[in-house]
């Protein structure tokens, strides 16, 4: 399966049987190279990936400044140290799951809930970890 198929079929999927889906998603290498993304995923800046990777290595690094992605600032909320970063902006937010080689991004807006975004992103991330990726 291509990386784009993972994005299209597993991240941009129908979450609840009602046609709800993430606003944007991507699979990005630890070096910031985009492996695959939805058409709506923002253009990443190198310093944003550097900050995200540093927060995985040093949990709490992004808390004072916020998580920036494509120039959008998210307030960092509870995650899982070294594994998951979560952010909030208005009625939407972001979940980032770190695997051995990649970062799985999911961005949501209402009516999709934070829990639904977490489930979609972490399910694919956990699968990739199991596959050694």
Curated annotation (Swiss-Prot):
Does this entry carry the keyword Nuclease? Answer: no
Please list the residues that carry the modification Phosphothreonine: 113
Task: Quote the subunit structure annotation.
Answer: Occurs in many kinds of cells as a complex with monomeric actin in a 1:1 ratio.
Q: Family assignment?
A: Belongs to the profilin family.
| Cellular component terms (Gene Ontology) | cell cortex; cytoskeleton
Q: How is it modified after translation?
A: Phosphorylated by MAP kinases.
Q: Give the subcellular location.
A: Cytoplasm, Cytoskeleton
Could you tell me which InterPro entries the record lists for this protein? PFN (IPR048278), PFN_euk (IPR005455), PFN_sf (IPR036140), Profilin_CS (IPR027310)
Q: Matching Pfam families, A to Z?
A: Profilin
Which controlled-vocabulary keywords does the entry list? Actin-binding, Allergen, Cytoplasm, Cytoskeleton, Disulfide bond, Phosphoprotein
The protein depicted here goes by the name Profilin-3
Instruction: Describe the function of this protein.
Output: Binds to actin and affects the structure of the cytoskeleton. At high concentrations, profilin prevents the polymerization of actin, whereas it enhances it at low concentrations.
List GO molecular-function terms, semicolon-separated: actin monomer binding
Organism name = Corylus avellana (European hazel)
Q: List the disulfide bonds.
A: 13-117
Q: What is noted besides the main data? A: The variability of the residues taking part of IgE-binding epitopes might be responsible of the difference in cross-reactivity among olive pollen cultivars, and between distantly related pollen species, leading to a variable range of allergy reactions among atopic patients.
